[in-house]
Amino acid sequence: MENTGFYVIPNKTQYEIGERVWLEIKKTGPTKANHVKVSLFTYQGENLKMECTLEQGVYIPLAESISEKTGGYLVKIEFFQKTEKLGSCYTAFDVVNCWTEAPRYGFLSSFSEEDKQKEEYQEFFREMHLNVIQFYDWMYRHDEFYPESDIYTDIMGRKGSMTAVAKKIEGVHACGAKAIAYGAVYGAESFQEEHPECSYRYDNGEPMIFIDKIWLMDIHRLSLIHISEPTR
């Protein structure tokens, strides 16, 4: 028997020691359920059981003791109308000292001006428990990250907004994940014109060029290659 009127997700993609764990119950259709039973399990067995009414709100706080030590938890939510069980659903969460103990990778790749108000990705990351999000191709150019104005056109001809990038960083942090910047330090555009000797080349001497736009550079020539401050 499965619930069709609700699903549940944690309010963050991952929790650090001491962070209070909240479960968000989201309604997906009509239901007669008026209260729930919450059960937490570890590999050692059942860890916690509690009940609450749905009238108490869509967020259920778990005991603070849950986040006092590291571990992973399976969550089972059972929905009832009085004593009749209507269905159930599941989610999970983990508690860590640092995200590097259990990284789960996701990415964002759209940074247009229209995207800066969109927040749907936060719920998706929470549902999928993705806790480290790479901002892919967020920059103006591979060898010149920041444009002169907020709105820019990247090397692929796509419109972007640095305000949208900043807003999405805030959104990623708000849902408990970490934001990391993609940076192809081996790729260059205008820089290669000043230092063609740093280009990787085939045996015939022709430079290695990706999609006819990005020159592949020999990053071992540190005395010649410029590494921009944001990459350090």
Predicted regions and their residues:
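Short edge beta-strand/loop segments characteristic of extracellular beta-sandwich folds
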Residues: 20-28
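Active-site-adjacent "subsite" loops/lids of carbohydrate-active enzymes
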Residues: 181, 185-228, 232
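Short, compositionally biased P/S/T/A/G/V-rich stretches that sit at domain boundaries
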Residues: 1-16
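Beta-strand-rich binding/interaction modules
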Residues: 32-44, 75-77
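The substrate-binding groove and active-site-proximal loops of carbohydrate-active enzymes
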Residues: 102-115, 145-162, 217-224, 228, ...
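An acidic-aromatic substrate-binding cleft motif
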Residues: 87-141
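Extended acidic/polar, glycine-enriched regions
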Residues: 46-100
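Aromatic-lined carbohydrate-binding/catalytic grooves of carbohydrate-active enzymes
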Residues: 121-166, 177, 186-206
